Regions:
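Polybasic "coupling" helices that flank or enter modular domains
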Residues: 46-48, 63-130
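Cyclic-nucleotide recognition modules
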Residues: 18-78, 86
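Alpha-helical bundle regulatory/interaction domains
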Residues: 58-59, 81, 146-147
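Glycine- and acidic-residue-biased ligand/ion/polar-headgroup-sensing regions
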Residues: 1-13, 23-25, 43, 100
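Short acidic-glycine loop/turn motifs at beta-strand connectors
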Residues: 12, 47-48, 150
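Alpha-helix/helix-capping structural signal
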Residues: 2, 57-58, 121, 160
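Structural motif
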Residues: 4, 48-51, 153
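Phosphate-/nucleic-acid-contacting segments
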Residues: 106-190
Length: 190
């Protein structure tokens, strides 16, 4: 997958919030790995990209034939569970600017370049906040020179600075991904 996909939970009133993010390090379709036919979340591509698609029957057959595939995907599932757990705490304890910086870093880790398509509307849904809150937070990050935000397009201009503005959740999630699946961010120029 070359974009960023979000696992989003939609409430009865239609409001949605992100409960997990994946990109080139993972896959969507976790319920099949866990032998469930019901998905409690919807998958939404938040940053456009490409992905390979595999019929469920072929996926399940590959899992039956390969213990190593099952083991790798199970480790990813645990990494995603860790991320989801951390996001619950993050949404409770950290301010919008910190969460915005965390989300942008997580997306940046999964992208091949520093700029990507992203609207305030999408980011507000991912963070579970009002669009106006994202506009303020993104404006603050932009004023600090950490990002450039143009209509529907964000560029990370100072990754180190953005890392300093992000809450501890970014680092906690990243360390677990590195430990469990060997996922590490791309090399960044100073």
């Amino acid at each position: 997958m070359s974009g960023v996909a979000s696992l989003a939970k939609t409430m009865e009133n239609g409001a949605s919030a992100e409960v997990g993010t994946t990109g080139n390090e993972g896959f969507v379709g976790l319920p099949f790995l866990l032998e469930s036919e019901h998905a409690p979340t919807a998958v939404q591509m938040q940053v456009p990209g490409h992905a390979l698609r595999l019929p469920a029957r072929a996926f399940l057959g590959a899992l039956e034939r390969s213990q190593s595939l099952h083991r790798v995907l199970s480790r990813f599932a645990f990494a995603l569970y860790t991320q989801t757990s951390q996001l619950v705490a993050c949404n409770r304890f950290h301010d919008v600017e910190q969460r915005c910086a965390r989300w942008l870093l997580m997306a940046h880790d999964r992208m091949p370049h520093d700029d990507f398509l992203l609207t305030h509307e999408v980011l507000s849904m991912m963070l579970g906040v009002r669009r106006s809150s994202v506009t303020i937070a993104a404006g603050q990050l932009s004023e600090m020179g950490l990002i450039e935000y143009r209509r529907g397009h964000v560029t990370v201009t100072d990754r180190a600075g953005l890392e300093m503005r992000a809450c501890e959740c970014y680092w906690s999630i990243r360390r677990e991904y590195e430990r469990l699946i060997g996922f590490a961010e791309k090399e960044y120029a100073d």
